[in-house]
Amino acid sequence: KFTQQKFTVDKTAPVIDVSFDNNSAKNGNYYKADRTATIKITEHNFNSGSQYVNIPVTAEGTTAPSVVGWSGSGDDHNATVSFNKDGKYSFTVDYTDLAGNKAVQKKVDSFYIDKTAPEVEITGVADHQAYNGTVAPVVTYRDDNFADDHDFRFTKIDINGKSDDTSKFDYDTGGNGVTEFIYKYRDFAEVLENDGIYNFTVELSDKAGNSTSKSVTFSVNRFGSTFRTTDEPTEKLINNGYTNAEQDIVVEEINVTPLTKHSVTLAKSGGNSTELVENTDYTFTSSNNGNEWCKSVYTVNKKNFSDEAAYTVTIMSVDKAKNTNNNRMADSSLSTEQKNKRECAISFVVDKTSPLVSITGIKDNELYKEASKKVKIVCEDDNLDKSKLVVTLDNKKLAEGEDYTIVDDKDGSIAGMLTAEIVLKAETGGIKENLKVTIGDLAGNTGEKSVDNFILSANIFQRFFANPVLVICTFAGLALVIAAVIFFVAKKRKKAE
C-alpha cells in the first residue's frame, strides 16, 4: 500500500536581473554618488537560503557591503546592495532553485564610487600678495582617481581693463602621475607688460567628475608706478613750462599695488628743496580695493608757487612690492619710450612780469625834416618769446626781413633781449603816423610801446601843411596883412576924393 505524497515538477530555470538607481557614469565606470543595486530573481519556488543564493561582492579600498533581505510578490523576489563608500566594486549573482535548475549567472563588472573632490594646493604665490622678483605659481593636484582634466586661467587686470593672459605662461609637470600631479609654472618674464594684478583660477576634475576650484589674486609689480596728469591746466603748464599765474598742480600715480609711503618735495630757484606738508601744502587721496590697480592723486596747492621763480616738484613713494618710485625717474631697465610714458617731470617757471619795450629814434608828436629815419626797437624779458614780436605802422603789420630786421650782437642774440631796426621813409605826404610794438613772453605776459603822431617829411611845404598851428598862424597873419592893405588903400582913396 502506497502513501500519497505531494511533489512538484519544476523544469523552469530562474531568471536573474540586476538594476541600479544611479547610472550616471563618468569615464565609463566612475560614479560621484552612491549606487544601490536591486537584485531581482524571478522564480516560482524561491528560497533565499545560502545554499541557493550566492552573491559575492568584491571591494577594494573599503569593506564590501552586505545584501539586504529579500522581499517579493508572486514569482519576483528582490534584495538590495548599497554602495555608499568610496571604493572599487564588483559582484556576481548565482541562484539554483529547489529543483536544481540554475539561473544564468549575472555578473556586474567593476565600477568605482568616488565622492571625494580632488585636493588642490596653490603655492609659489599667495592671495593678495605683491611680487617684484620671482613669480612662479605651482599647482599640486591629489586624487585617487586622477584625471588630467583641468582648467587654469590667468585673468590680468591692468589700468586699461581685463584680459585673458593664460596662454602667455608655460608650465612643466611633475608628481607620480597616479595620485599626484604637479604643474610648475616658469618664472614670469621680467617685462613691463607682465606687471599687473592677476586672478589665477584653478579648476580640476577627477575621473568621477568631482571638481575643485581654487583661486588666488596676486600682483606682479617689478617696474613700480606710472605718473601722469589728467588735469588739463596742469598738463598745459607742464607742456609749456611757463605761467604768469600760480595754479594747483594735480598728478596721478598709478601702481599695481597700494602705496606704503609717499612724499612731495618742492625745489625753488634761489632756495633749497623743501618737503611739503600733507593736508597743508598738498592733499593726497588713494583708492584700492585689492582687485584693481591703486590710483593715488596728489594736489599741490597753488600757494606754494606765489613767487616768481623756477619750480620743480618731485613725488616719491614706496609701494607694497617695495619698489621706490619717482615721478622724474622710471626704472632704468625700461626703454626710452616706456620711461616717457611712466614719468611725469614737473618743472616750470612762474613769471608775472611783462616784457619791457623801448623805441628810440622817434618821439610822440615830433616833426622830422628828413626823408627817412632809422628807428631802434629793444625788447627785454628773462623769458622773452621772440616769435611773438609784432610791429605795426598805422595799424598795418610789418614783415620781418622786408620792413624791419632783427639785429644780433657779435656773439649772437642776447638772452632775454631782442633788438630790431626799422627805417621809416617819408612816403605819406606829411601825414601823422603811429608806430606800435607788441611782444609776449613764454609765460603769456604782454609788453607794448607806441610812438604816436610823428611826422616824417623832407618837403618844406609838406612839413608846413603838416603843422596846423603854423598853418593857422600863417593864414591869420596873412589875413591881417591883407586887411591892413585894404584899409590903407581905402583910406587913401577917400582922401583923394
Where are these regions (language model features)?
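Extracellular acidic loop/turn motifs
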Residues: 41-52, 62, 141-152, 253-261, ...
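C-terminal membrane-anchoring or membrane-association module
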Residues: 479-497
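Surface-exposed, short loops/turns at beta-strand junctions within beta-sandwich domains
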Residues: 81-88, 188-197, 300-310, 422-432
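Short, solvent-exposed loop/edge segments of extracellular or virion-exposed proteins
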Residues: 15-28, 121-131, 228-240, 355-367, ...
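Aromatic sugar-binding surface patches on proteins
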Residues: 71-79, 174-187, 287-299, 409-423
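Short, solvent-exposed loop/turn segments at the edges of extracellular beta-sandwich modules
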Residues: 1, 96-102, 205-210, 318-337, ...
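Flexible, low-complexity linkers/stalks enriched in Thr/Pro that connect modular domains
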Residues: 3-14, 108-121, 206, 216-230, ...
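Membrane-proximal extracellular "stem/stalk" segments
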Residues: 341-354, 378-380, 393-395, 402-463
